Amino acid sequence: MVTRVGSGFSVQRVWLLLVIVVVLCGSVTQQASAWFTNDECPGVMGNRDLYEKVAWVCNDCANIFRNNDVGVMCKKDCFHTMDFLWCVYATERHGEIDQFRKWVSILRAGRK
């Protein structure tokens, strides 16, 4: 009889551990997707690849000038700033300006 109680107790521990793992995994997933939902760009959900391409310009610009504030200002208002255009030229991607404008308009879709 003691072995049953002992084995029942270990089964409870296993279930408890399983529940904790599932809850923690769900929490991590929500935090990862929150980065995109809390962003200033309403069209980023479903367009993460576009967001990454446009954000890459800002990251490169911040690296060129060794100043994180440049990258932050570039991404402000969902890339709809003169700082973003300045970074496009600073990273010598001015030939792609029309493509970047299309991508930014997609990312800004639904914005009030």
Swiss-Prot record:
It comes from the Eukaryota. One of its GO terms (molecular function) is neuropeptide hormone activity. The keyword Transmembrane does not apply. It is found in: Secreted. Its main location: secreted. InterPro entries: Crust_neurhormone_CS, Crust_neurohorm, Crust_neurohorm_sf, Hyperglycemic, Hyperglycemic2. Keywords: Amidation, Disulfide bond, Hormone, Neuropeptide, Secreted, Signal. Disulfide bonds join C41-C78, C58-C74, C61-C87. The modification Alanine amide is found at A109. GO terms for biological process: neuropeptide signaling pathway. Produced in the eyestalk X-organ sinus gland complex of male and female lobsters. Residues 1-31 form the signal peptide. It holds the Pfam family Crust_neurohorm. GO terms for cellular component: extracellular region. Belongs to the arthropod CHH/MIH/GIH/VIH hormone family. Inhibits vitellogenesis in female animals. Plays a prominent role in the regulation of reproduction/molting processes. This is Gonad-inhibiting hormone. It comes from Homarus americanus (American lobster).
